[in-house]
UniProtKB/Swiss-Prot annotation:
Name by which UniProt lists this protein: TBC1 domain family member 13
Superkingdom field: Eukaryota
InterPro entries: Rab-GAP-TBC_dom, Rab-GAP_TBC_sf
Pfam families given in the database record: RabGAP-TBC (PF00566)
Location in or out of the cell: Membrane; Cytoplasm
Alphabetical keyword list: Cytoplasm, GTPase activation, Membrane
Tissue: Expressed in adipocytes.
Major place of residence: membrane
Gene Ontology MF terms: GTPase activator activity; small GTPase binding
Any one of the GO CC terms: membrane
Length: 400
């Protein structure tokens, strides 16, 4: 470890040990990258994402309150309607007479359960493929959710819900005449999503299953947006960072902490995921056009070239902006970019500058290339040095 790196760690420690943390100092340090040693990044992100307040004295009580609240969400939302949950005040006889799976009432708990399953299956499909370049999300967590997995309780795991729902959809088929046929899943040669990764034994769960639970609870609490494909790519780096914290106490509560940080982050970017807002000033279309207007201001020659080739920002910037560049770089580089994004007071204005910098840094290739070549460049970005990109974005910011 270089003396410069040791000095940076000491600077962070000095800022973080103050009874009242000075946010501007923390932002200034974090913008240039947060050391991963000693759990510094995890702590800084929790402050920068407004999960932890600046007053250190209140951390213990707030963490206890929020983690307790998350446990309550688990109790309330990961249950199967129609099964007695004595410790939640739901008894079998109450459910049997008032509700049943064929109840047509839209407010029926069974109707809600089936709709939730549709959302759950989409989440399940997406989280199984999270960060395929590393094995982390397929490995077992050291801290499985005992509230869900303990055989002494009556909670149903999301894993079982997915298995049961998928099994029914695979084995029951209706032909064009409307006749329902039962088929054995063993005769189906198509690979099942459930078999894509080895299923862990009872009492264990993979990291992707934890992410699945976070997203499912978020969808339940936010029915207006629920779950949109791509949210998994936002929560993934957050959870990875918190679940690899060297401090076991922090790591044990990675799920709850990730949920609240993800919720706070989504409060800032959720408009990107709402299609009805695409063309509004807070929507994704406006932001994509802002990338091009910024490029026009900084490099008009390159802007005109892209316009001439009819390369619209929707062709590449939609993914860049919506997913906070999480699909353009390897996970460690994404995390480094997010250090700067989270630290910047106008963080998503800075994201626009990062996107603009990415274009300018490959300007020579773009000016020489035709439509096909340039689309390939933009959809499979060639530069891997994210520090170079961030430096260029900072130059653009300072030159305003």
């Amino acid at each position: 470890m270089s003396s410069l790196h040791k000095s940076r760690i000491a600077d962070f420690q000095d800022v973080l040990k103050e009874p009242s943390i000075v946010l501007e100092k923390l932002r200034e340090l974090s913008f240039s990258g947060i050391p991963c040693e000693g759990g510094l990044r995890c702590l800084c992100w929790k402050i920068l994402l407004n999960y932890l307040p600046l007053e250190r004295a209140s951390w213990t009580s707030i963490l206890a309150k929020q983690r307790g609240l998350y446990s309550q969400f688990l109790r309330e939302m990961i249950i199967q309607p129609g099964i007695a949950k004595a410790n939640m005040g739901v008894f079998r006889e109450d459910v049997t007479f008032e509700d049943h799976p064929l109840n047509p009432n839209p407010d029926s708990r069974w109707n809600t359960y089936f709709k939730d399953n549709e959302v759950l299956l989409q989440i399940d499909k997406d989280v199984r493929r999270l960060c395929p370049d590393i094995s982390f999300f397929q490995r077992a967590t050291e801290y499985p959710c005992l509230l869900i997995l303990d055989p002494q309780n009556e909670f149903e795991t999301l894993r079982k819900r997915v298995e049961q729902t998928t099994l029914k959809s695979q084995t029951v088929a209706r032909n064009r005449s409307g006749v329902t046929n039962m088929s054995s899943p063993h005769k189906n040669s198509a690979p099942s999503a459930l078999n894509e990764y080895e299923v862990l034994p009872n009492g264990c769960e993979a990291h992707w299953e934890v992410v699945e639970r976070i997203l499912f609870i978020y969808a339940k609490l936010n029915p207006g947006i629920a779950y949109v494909q791509g949210m998994n790519e936002i929560v993934g780096p957050l959870y990875y960072t918190f679940a690899t914290d060297p401090n076991s106490e922090w790591k044990e509560h990675a799920e709850a902490d990730t949920f609240f940080c993800f919720t706070n982050l989504m409060a800032e970017i959720r408009d990107n995921f709402i299609k009805s807002l695409d063309d509004s000033q807070c929507g994704i279309t406006y932001k994509m056009e802002k990338v091009y207007s910024t490029l026009k201001d900084k490099d008009v020659e390159l802007y005109l070239k892209l316009q001439e080739q009819s390369i619209k920002p929707q062709f590449f910037a939609f993914r860049w902006l919506t997913l906070l560049l999480s699909q353009e770089f390897l996970l460690p580089d994404v995390i480094r970019i997010w250090d700067s994004l989270f630290a910047d007071g106008n963080r998503f204005d800075f994201l626009l500058l990062v996107c603009c910098a990415m274009l300018i840094l490959i300007r020579e290739q773009l000016l020489e290339g035709d439509f096909t070549v340039n689309m390939r460049l933009l959809q499979d970005y060639p530069i891997t040095d994210v520090c170079q990109i961030l430096q260029k974005a900072k130059e653009l910011q300072d030159s305003k």
